[in-house]
């Protein structure tokens, strides 16, 4: 009976992970949410009744330690798979060129992105590592982004979401550092994976956001002419899970791969 912990599990891709994993009654599935009283957290209680949930902000090490003890009680001591999904994408810089950001916004968005998407991931891994060591699968996965691939960014001028993208690139290296430090010697898989291009339900975009999305879609089609539409979140989760289940420390330790298990991002 494998156990999974998904951070950022109250909505979006994190909720899709919980929904898919909990469809197998043999799985022990736990969602980590920042605030159970948030309106975004209601799906955990209202729809996925076989999902456990614990509360912690991933930038708060003390709260994460408390959550780890709660997870230990749920699983009986170990944890098979940790999926670091919680992340922040600052809306002010999502489709604004770097040179058009004010110095204050530039600094704020980079620091916020790195605090959550890099430091928060490190705090989360450290808090749950003792449980991973006692698990069977021993896998620590960080959800990254195709925007974090330098060659793709350079070759196809993907200039959007700069703070988010650089924080995800740093998170990729963080996984490689964990692998270098203890992954190979302890048999723990540390890996970053891009979910691909995924459609996400949201509010109607502004005119500027809509234009930014159109420009990005055109660049992605130049990279992958076969690309016709984003995947649904459910499609992305299924493909990611297949890659994760087949990944090994020997072949994928410290790697950054796509939802296809390679460097083909779409």
Curated annotation (Swiss-Prot):
Biotechnology: Secalonic acids show unprecedented anticancer activities against various human cancer cells and might be interesting for further derivatization, targeting diseases such as cancer.
Active site per UniProt: 145, 164, 168
Keywords: NADP, Oxidoreductase
Positions that bind NADP(+): 13, 57, 85, 164, 168, 198
A Pfam family assignment: adh_short
One MF term in the entry's GO annotations: oxidoreductase activity, acting on the CH-OH group of donors, NAD or NADP as acceptor
Entry EC number(s): 1.1.1.-
GO BP, sorted A to Z: secondary metabolite biosynthetic process
Pathway per the UniProt entry: Secondary metabolite biosynthesis
Membership in a protein family: Belongs to the short-chain dehydrogenases/reductases (SDR) family.
Biological role stated in the UniProt entry: Short-chain dehydrogenase/reductase; part of the gene cluster that mediates the biosynthesis of the tetrahydroxanthone dimer secalonic acid D. The pathway begins with the synthesis of atrochrysone thioester by the polyketide synthase AacuL. The atrochrysone carboxyl ACP thioesterase AacuM then breaks the thioester bond and releases the atrochrysone carboxylic acid from AacuL. Atrochrysone carboxylic acid is decarboxylated by the decarboxylase AacuI, and oxidized by the anthrone oxygenase AacuG to yield emodin. Emodin is then reduced to emodin hydroquinone by a yet unidentified oxidoreductase.
Name recorded for this polypeptide: Short-chain dehydrogenase/reductase AacuF
Organism per entry: Aspergillus aculeatus (strain ATCC 16872 / CBS 172.66 / WB 5094)
């Amino acid at each position: 009976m494998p156990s999974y912990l998904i951070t950022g599990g109250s909505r979006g891709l994190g909720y899709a992970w919980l929904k898919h994993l909990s469809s197998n009654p043999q799985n022990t599935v736990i969602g980590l949410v920042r605030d159970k009283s948030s309106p975004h957290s209601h799906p955990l209680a209202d729809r996925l009744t076989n999902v456990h949930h614990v509360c912690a902000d991933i930038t708060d090490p003390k709260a994460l330690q408390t959550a780890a003890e709660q997870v230990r009680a749920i699983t009986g001591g170990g944890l098979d798979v940790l999926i670091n999904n919680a992340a922040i994408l600052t809306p002010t810089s999502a489709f604004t060129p770097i040179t058009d950001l004010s110095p204050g916004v530039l600094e704020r968005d980079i620091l916020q992105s790195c605090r959550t998407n890099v430091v928060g991931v490190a705090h989360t891994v450290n808090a749950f590592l003792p449980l991973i060591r006692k698990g069977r699968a021993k896998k620590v996965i960080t959800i990254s982004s195709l925007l974090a691939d330098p060659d793709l960014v350079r070759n196809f001028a993907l200039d959007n979401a700069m703070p988010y993208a650089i924080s995800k690139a740093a998170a990729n290296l963080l996984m490689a550092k964990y692998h270098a430090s203890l992954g190979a010697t302890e048999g723990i898989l540390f890996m970053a994976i891009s979910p691909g291009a995924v459609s996400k339900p949201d509010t109607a975009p502004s005119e500027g956001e809509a234009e930014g999305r159109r420009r990005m879609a055109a660049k992605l089609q130049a990279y992958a002419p076969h690309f016709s539409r984003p995947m649904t979140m459910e499609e992305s989760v299924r493909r990611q899970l297949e890659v994760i289940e087949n990944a090994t420390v020997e072949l994928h330790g410290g790697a950054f791969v796509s939802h296809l298990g390679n460097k083909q991002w779409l």
